[in-house]
Amino acid sequence: SGIDGTVSTAVGAALAHQADGGGEAFALLGDLTLLHDQNGLLLGPQEPRPDLAVVVVNNDGGGIFSGLEQAGHPDFERVFGTPHGVSVEQVAAVADLPYTHLEWAADLPKALLGEGLRLVEVRTDRAASARLRRALQDAVAEAVADTVR
């Protein structure tokens, strides 16, 4: 995986899926992935529109890198964390797309409803997510170790 062309790939995959008789499509992206390829949201006036909900997990940077060895480096935040402060709502407005800010997990099914290309934003705390990720990894490692004993 990576961030180059992910939005454009999701749009193309959704269009292919729907051309093949499939229904709506969904893409789950991080905020940096969206920002890196936000031009993929800008479709020409003659281009078909996918029925695609793009869900953006926004932790204001590269939260996935918090679990790597370099997370303790003094320049981690500047080089890997890369906080941006960009509004996903404004990205949606520039592309003239519907936007939903999701506050509660229970509201996700409703937030995914709609037609056409649309953005759903879920804001998370990067540090809390890193702690949760570590706890889940530890629990999985312990369960696997218990299984092989």
Regions from the language model: what does each represent?
Residues 1-149:
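Thiamine diphosphate
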